[in-house]
């Protein structure tokens, strides 16, 4: 049986909404953050390492690092000749598995597109569904409609995406909406959502138990006063 990796990197949900961040910057962000030391809260991968992990040119890495730093989503501390990277805390995030990030049959642009689009997917049973038109999605993820169309065609050929005509109509154009189904199992992303949802449910149960304990203590204190 194939071993499923549980390792993943977290991407802030609102990052793609910050101007002038583009999808390619998200790939670089994740390529850096995957090296984060949980104890120190820092990491120090070289530009060459980031370039290799992201599948991007050194100049692209430099530009993205500059953009991420200027927007406040990447903190750079210089110690001698070494650059240390850290990240501000964020409450909501999208998880991306190491297996997905390391997929060799996906191009840099395809990964950038999928990473930027993931937060707009309705995720269920190993599938991620998007009902936005290419034009609507282009506006949300800061990527051209033409590029999205080209990448979608490539993902369909690679069996990572299925596009189906919906019975629903676009309220403005009256044209049937195309529903896009991204195959998260094949993209090595489904297991991450399963684990993340499980952890969230555990945390919710823990919070409920703590709230119940607090309420019982309050009632006991009230009864004692009487």
Residue ranges of model-derived segments:
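Electropositive, intrinsically flexible nucleic-acid-contacting patches
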Residues: 1-226
């Amino acid at each position: 049986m194939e071993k499923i990796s549980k390792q993943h990197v977290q991407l802030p949900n609102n990052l793609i909404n910050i101007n002038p961040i583009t999808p390619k910057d998200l790939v670089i962000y994740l390529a850096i953050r995957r090296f984060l030391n949980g104890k120190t809260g820092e990491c120090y991968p070289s530009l060459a390492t980031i370039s290799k992990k992201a599948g991007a040119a050194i100049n692209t890495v430099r530009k993205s690092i500059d953009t991420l730093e200027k927007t406040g989503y990447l903190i750079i501390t210089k110690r001698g000749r070494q650059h240390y990277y850290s990240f501000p805390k964020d409450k909501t995030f999208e998880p991306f598995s190491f297996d997905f990030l390391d997929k060799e049959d996906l191009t840099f642009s395809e990964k950038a597109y999928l990473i930027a689009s993931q937060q707009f997917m309705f995720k269920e049973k190993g599938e991620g569904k998007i009902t936005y038109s290419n034009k609507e999605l282009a506006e949300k993820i800061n990527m051209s409609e033409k590029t999205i169309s080209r990448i979608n065609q490539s993902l369909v050929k690679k069996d990572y995406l299925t596009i189906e005509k919906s019975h629903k109509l676009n309220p403005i154009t009256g044209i049937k909406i195309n529903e896009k189904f991204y195959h998260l199992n094949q993209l090595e992303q489904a297991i991450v959502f399963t684990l993340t949802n499980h952890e969230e449910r555990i945390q919710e149960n823990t919070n409920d138990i703590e709230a119940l304990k607090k309420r019982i203590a309050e009632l006991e204190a009230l009864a004692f006063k009487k």
